Amino acid sequence: MYALLSVYDKTGLLELAKALTSKGVKLLGSGGTAKMIRESGMEVADVSSITNAPEILGGRVKTLHPAVHGGILARDIPSDEKDLVEQSIEKIDIVVCNLYPFRETIAKPNVTIPEAVEEIDIGGVTLLRAAAKNHARVTILSDPADYATFTDKFLSDKLTQDDRNTYALKAFASTASYDAAITDYFRKQYAAGVDQLTLRYGANPHQSPAQAFMEQGPLPFKVLCGSPGYINLMDALNSWPLVKELRENIGIPAAASFKHVSPAGAAVGLPLSDVEKKVYFVSDITEFTPLACAYARARGADRMSSFGDFIALSDTVDVCTARIISREVSDGVIAPGYEPEALELLKKKKGGKYCVLQMDPKYVPAEIETRQVYGISLQQHRNHAKIDFSLFEKVVSKNKDLPKSALIDLVIATTALKYTQSNSVCYAKNGMVVGLGAGQQSRIHCNRLAGDKADNWWLRHHPKVLGMQFKKSAKRPEKSNAIDLYVLDAVPAEGSEREQWESAFETIPEPLTKKEREEFLATCKDVVCASDAFFPFPDNIYRLAQSGVKYVAAPGGSVMDQAVRDTANEFNMVFSEIPLRLFHH
């Protein structure tokens, strides 16, 4: 029985060699490994004794030879046995190998590419893969931490095929990890900005280093301006498929306003009424494109949440849309293209540091997606559920009248849920998200949050709000905040906050009375609501009714499904049971 030893990390080497020789195993060693064993007084043959070839190229070629790999890869079958006899090759039953310290080398400051290259192990990786491939016969030890357990079993003749299987898996994992480190290093050296993008830091400033990269080929987006951060890319790469799918499934340009990996707003480009233009702060614009309408709606749905958003647009960005973006506070935008004048407008934001990404509209992500949580890799099939009009065909309520306008809103609300942190509930109306409750552990709390946002959105249409007279010096965020406090009935009666609120106005508006609020909210009708999972109790339906919801979409599966449907029937709602749960994390 032969064992081949070729290690960089010589931890435990001599103890292992001693155990092997005590059982009559003949040792073969390469270079420094053989030297260390020999100097300890044990007998070991150099690899060159079976290859009849010396180490060459300064040690770059030591074990790459048919006499070595034939002995490792040979199976216990007649044809392989015949080949070994004809070539005078002995079988090798045990391989002990670990690799040059590539990771440790590149971690050193100011390491050069030639220095890194010299730590790329070739023969070692080949030994590991060859022995692991033939693990039906060969034992491969790639980790010194396994020597003691192996020795105990080997000396007591208790080494099993299961042990060889485990060692082989570890060897394959070792070579995969090693190659990944090499690829990562050279990706940064030779494909920075193409296959790889170095980020300032991760989710927080202390989480450095950080990067975005593709394992195969170039990144599907180009940075046209600015420097995207980790959170920017999380928002961009979650919001882009949302608008892409809305465009494909509804046929109208779409926009999304993202904050912290959930949409603050999403919409398609339905024309804006004069009232809506006032509500969304675009009444001074005379000409609108569908894309501009889409972003005005997406941004205007929840202006407080959209402050500092990342924008996704389904179509080439035109000048009209760029002008709306240019006067709002946002972090960046992703779109399939930009008109030259529009791009120049966007490049002026943030003193030239505004993040502008151009997405490849033909890019299709891999079917299997992987992420790490606390060092554990989780893998799943990508959520490629198609959300179009056909999804809502199963109507389980007595009222089955689903007009085209409601179907459009259902597609918008449900698609938004697909890219919203769960649990989530979404209200939509007029081609846009009007209230979204995300990331709550309780569905009723999601529902209340979404419903309250929808109520606030509708109250911003109130004549008292539309008639507010702001000072010319009042900035857009100040106006948004003042309106938000007003419609929430949260303006303090006195004090510095009250003074600050009043300072935005030429004329202090009269407060909305409880009666005015209730009467105006009662005029909001035909609202759509979608849920990313079933409604567990009828209390959700009662909350929907408070905000004028007429059309509901949610999956079934609760023991209370019938009670929920019965309650929806009490309010003459149209309830579509969809065959999808849409959790997103």
Swiss-Prot record:
The IMP cyclohydrolase activity resides in the N-terminal region. The gene is ade10. It comes from the Eukaryota. Residues 1-142 form the MGS-like domain. It comes from Schizosaccharomyces pombe (strain 972 / ATCC 24843) (Fission yeast). 5-amino-1-(5-phospho-beta-D-ribosyl)imidazole-4-carboxamide binds at R200, Y201, H260, G308, D331, N423, R443, F534, R581. This is Bifunctional purine biosynthesis protein ade10. IMP binds at S30, G31, G32, T33, R60, V61, K62, T63, C97, N98, D121, I122. The record marks K259 as: Transition state stabilizer. It catalyses: (6R)-10-formyltetrahydrofolate + 5-amino-1-(5-phospho-beta-D-ribosyl)imidazole-4-carboxamide = 5-formamido-1-(5-phospho-D-ribosyl)imidazole-4-carboxamide + (6S)-5,6,7,8-tetrahydrofolate; IMP + H2O = 5-formamido-1-(5-phospho-D-ribosyl)imidazole-4-carboxamide.
